[in-house]
Amino acid sequence: MSADPRHYDVIVAPVITEKATNLSELNKVVFRVAPKATKPQIKEAVEKLFEVKVKSVNTLVTKGKTKMFRGQRGQRSDVKKAIVTLEEGQTIDVTTGL
């Protein structure tokens, strides 16, 4: 199973937070993904890049906050995250990188 270069465009970065760490105990991993990435694309990218079996993918979009910058109102970018549930016995060590 070789990774297609497009898979690297789908997965942006792992999310390392307290909540994401707690989810890892439930066999789930959280990634920041491209805003236009679909669930099947995310599933395929994770399976090819990390060589694991994915059970399901849940996505969420965090809307960017409005902030003041030099007296002007600005908008931060929206962030899309994917919570990937792995099959039993499968693990991903997100600290090692790709």
UniProtKB/Swiss-Prot annotation:
Keyword hit for rRNA-binding: yes
Gene Ontology cellular-component annotations: ribonucleoprotein complex; ribosome
Keywords tagged on the record: Ribonucleoprotein, Ribosomal protein, RNA-binding, rRNA-binding
Pfam family, one: Ribosomal_L23
Gene3D superfamilies from the UniProt entry: 3.30.70.330
GO biological process: translation
Leader sequence residues: none
GO MF assignments: rRNA binding; structural constituent of ribosome
KW Transferase (keyword) present: no
Quaternary structure (record): Part of the 50S ribosomal subunit. Contacts protein L29, and trigger factor when it is bound to the ribosome.
UniProt similarity note: Belongs to the universal ribosomal protein uL23 family.
Function of the protein: One of the early assembly proteins it binds 23S rRNA. One of the proteins that surrounds the polypeptide exit tunnel on the outside of the ribosome. Forms the main docking site for trigger factor binding to the ribosome.
Protein known as: Large ribosomal subunit protein uL23
Organism (species): Methylobacterium nodulans (strain LMG 21967 / CNCM I-2342 / ORS 2060)
